[in-house]
UniProtKB/Swiss-Prot annotation:
It comes from Mycobacterium leprae (strain TN). NCBIfam families: PRK02628.1. Residues 12-276 form the CN hydrolase domain. Its EC number is 6.3.5.1. This is Glutamine-dependent NAD(+) synthetase. One of its GO terms (biological process) is NAD biosynthetic process.
Length: 680
């Protein structure tokens, strides 16, 4: 596999093209098509889609009935066939063609000098400004072979064009109105296996119609788990009674990958790389997709499959799509605000229901002054407010150990006071020292020994205190560990931070926690003094504070052990949501993180923390992730306490999104990294 080649990584480059139409002049239109086709060829495009009735113009009306025009269209189709012999893209071109006793509005699919097939428009609008049935016949029930000059090609709406040398590229074509009907041809085609759905459109523009198209194209891509490539007619079409905007767009599974400006001058293209591997993954996971196929077997099975060899380009041709650095954290400010609002309230409502079900016990929580416990505390405070319970029912304990920092301890103390919760400090050092002495640990004899036992004794003592305090006060222990820590197994099992009575952070990744706290500050959920402490928490480095510093080295850093959470959350999302192989994850990570100046950052993200990572670093931390996720940490997830799912990226509950054996080897994933991911 060529690691740097996007086609090798499951991507297919597609283009939606529009041009200056010359109505009634097929030769001029064909020249425009070929210019755009050559540009697409140079850019490594696999599929290029043009507007409806590309060669004649859409607004030609009764001129469609002229033999001279129809013959000229056929001649230019043949010219394009010859001229495209050495071009990479599959060309999807609109043309009025004669078949039997009628004229059909068709898409001619051409590749490397061959007409692969001809797809007629199924549904002809004859309402409001449209009068297509006056000149044209519907093709919804046609399933035959059409002649274009001396060429013969399959004809019908039931054609799938599959690349024999590129797993995942299966093209279907529909035309304009076809996507406006309740059951469009593309829906049946997707069930039959199409992954790229093309729409050649005329679609004159009126106020609001562009948004209608966007909704329909987005919905089609989401429902069909497919890419939807849309190209509308634009400049040059007749404005006798109508106007045209040349809208082009590419959607993938509900996500907009590319869109051109509207009302463009001249020739324009929207180009993007569609992830067919992602689409196939989604279909495999969503069993109801195949159930729907079985239900509509009679419509799906007759589809004809035409194979061709694409012969995609080799080497690094870039990646023409945005890869979000933080897949759990959208860079769009409006979306981020909405996500934070929903995530926070999912957590609050989850805790509210648990409190109601238990007849309002006290909430016992260990507060360290770090991100996770801080966020859990403000969720608990809001839940109490909404349920009309006093915040004093939250029993917050700070449990300083051998290396608890002054700043984190101060953050915890000030936050609890500002919120008005019941706050107590219990120093665990005496208890931890006693346990270390009882088990004969070298630290109890004055030796420097900061091993895993030293760490876990502290973590275990803290949790033991919290559970006994919950017993004493009639409360429940509120867990604070987040999704990222669960994915990496960065927790102490059993009598440790892995266990609680209810964990509201279990579905929230570390990278999102920071933005949730920022959102809480920005949306003024609490008083000004609370906001000041929350900002101080955000400015503190992530550390479990279990191992002392020697005075010169930095305090124990979690990210130095398990990797940057930005990278590990990226990997976790790709595994949970799509099940991608490590080399695909490395490829995506490299495109997302190799250059801090490319792509968008979430709003408010600190400038000094906008880092980049080399492929060597990405490879190293991916190996750590794979080892910990697949081989080391599943036993901790198999015994998770309850907690709400938050992100569309997934969760790790063994009762929900992630069910896996606790005794599995990570060998095949590690081997794939060694084999397929270069170091530079």
């Amino acid at each position: 596999m060529d690691f740097y080649n996007s086609y090798s990584q499951g991507f297919v480059r597609v283009a939606a093209c529009t041009h200056h139409a010359s109505i009634g002049d097929p030769t001029t239109n064909a020249a425009s098509v070929l210019r755009l086709a050559r540009q697409c060829h140079d850019d490594g495009v696999a599929v290029a889609v043009f507007p409806e009735l590309t060669l004649s113009g859409y607004s030609i009306e009764d001129i469609l009935l002229q033999d001279l025009l129809l013959e000229a269209v056929e001649d230019t189709v043949l010219d394009i066939v010859v001229a495209s012999a050495d071009l990479l893209p599959v060309l999807v071109i609109g043309a009025p063609l004669r078949y039997r006793h009628r004229i059909y509005n068709t898409a001619v699919i051409i590749h490397r000098g061959v007409v692969l097939g001809v797809a007629p428009k199924s549904y002809l609008p004859t309402y409001r400004e449209f009068y297509e049935r006056r000149q044209l016949a519907p093709g919804d029930d046609e399933h035959g072979t059409i002649g274009i000059g001396d060429l013969r090609a399959p004809f019908g709406p039931d054609l799938l064009f599959a690349a024999a040398d590129l797993l995942g590229l299966v093209l279907h074509v529909e035309i304009c109105e076809d996507m406006f009907v309740p059951v469009p041809p593309s829906a049946e085609a997707a069930l039959a296996g199409a992954t790229v759905l093309a729409n050649l459109s005329g679609s004159p523009i009126t106020i609001g119609r562009a948004e209608d198209r966007r909704l329909l194209a987005r919905s089609a891509s989401l429902r069909c788990l497919a890419a939807y490539v849309y190209a509308a007619a634009g400049e040059g079409e007749s404005t006798t009674d109508l106007a045209w905007d040349g809208q082009t767009m590419i959607w993938e599974n509900g996500v907009l990958l590319a869109e051109s400006e509207r009302f463009p001058k001249g020739e324009h293209r929207s180009v993007a790389d569609v992830d067919t591997e992602l689409l196939r993954s989604e279909r495999l996971r969503m069993g109801t997709f195949n159930d729907n196929r079985r239900r509509h077997r009679a419509l799906v099975e007759p589809f004809r499959r035409i194979e061709f060899r694409l012969e995609p380009p080799v080497g690094n041709i870039g990646l023409l799509r945005e890869v979000e650095r933080f897949p759990f954290v959208p860079a769009d400010p409006q979306r981020l605000q909405q996500d934070c609002y929903e995530a926070y309230n999912i957590q609050v409502s989850g805790l509210e229901q648990r409190l109601r079900a238990l007849d309002y016990p006290k909430v016992v929580i260990g507060v360290s002054g770090g991100l996770d416990s801080t966020h859990a505390l403000i969720v608990a405070a809001r839940a109490m407010d909404r349920e009309g319970r006093p915040r004093s029912d939250i029993l917050a304990f700070t449990l300083p150990g051998f290396v608890t920092g002054d700043r984190t301890k101060s953050n915890a103390t000030e936050l609890c006071r500002a919120l008005g919760v019941t706050f107590t400090e219990i120093d665990i050092r005496d208890t931890a020292t006693l346990m270390l002495k009882k088990i004969g640990h070298p630290f109890s004899r004055g030796e420097v020994s900061y091993d895993v036992t030293f760490e876990n004794v502290q973590a275990g003592v803290r949790t033991d205190y919290l559970f006994r305090l919950a017993n004493q006060h009639g409360g429940i222990v509120l867990g604070t560990g987040d999704l990222s820590e669960l994915g990496l197994g960065w927790s102490t099992y059993g009598v440790g931070d892995q266990m609680s009575h209810y964990n509201i952070n279990a579905g929230v990744p570390k990278t999102l926690v920071q933005h949730l706290i920022r959102w809480v500050i920005a949306s003024s959920q609490f008083e000004e003094q609370v906001d000041k402490v929350l900002q101080s928490v955000l400015d503190t480095e992530i550390t479990p504070e279990l191992i002392p510093s020697d005075g010169e080295e930095k305090l124990q850093s979690t990210e130095a052990k398990v990797g940057p959470f930005a990278l590990q959350d990226f990997s976790l999302f790709q595994v949970l949501r799509y099940g991608f192989r490590p080399s695909k994850i490395a490829f995506l990570t490299w495109h997302a993180w190799s250059d801090p100046n490319c792509g968008k950052w979430p709003p408010g993200f600190p400038e000094d923390k906008r880092l980049s990572y080399s492929l060597k670093e990405i490879r190293h931390w991916l190996q750590i992730f794979v080892q910990r996720f697949y081989s080391f940490s599943q036993f901790k997830r198999s015994a998770l306490p309850n907690g709400p799912k938050v992100s569309h990226g997934g969760a790790l509950s063994p009762r929900g999104d992630w069910r896996a054996p606790s005794d599995m080897s990570a060998r095949i994933w590690l081997d794939e990294i060694e084999r397929e991911v270069p170091e530079e």
